[in-house]
């Protein structure tokens, strides 16, 4: 099964991402966001950028994570490469990644939405369904 698949959505974009762990779910979702947006990046920097987020629950944390990536793309024209999860609980996320300048974006995402957000674990496979406002 591929790590993500686009889902038909009338007004926005939606995707379902699958991974063998909750940590991998967050990194695969970042990849899905970049690929669906058509992000082309320069080679990654040797620098490390750390991001720390907190939320009330795992679904909110997941949406905050994707919106942080959207913010970095929009404001700084940066994407993260080689993302590693340093800490992940139901309410806390700490990641490290190498920032890369974005050469081009095919289509900008305004935000990841809470519409239909769902994270599940079945038979050792984690899945999340996300709707993006474009």
Residue ranges: model-predicted function:
Residues 1-134:
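Intrinsically disordered, low-complexity regions
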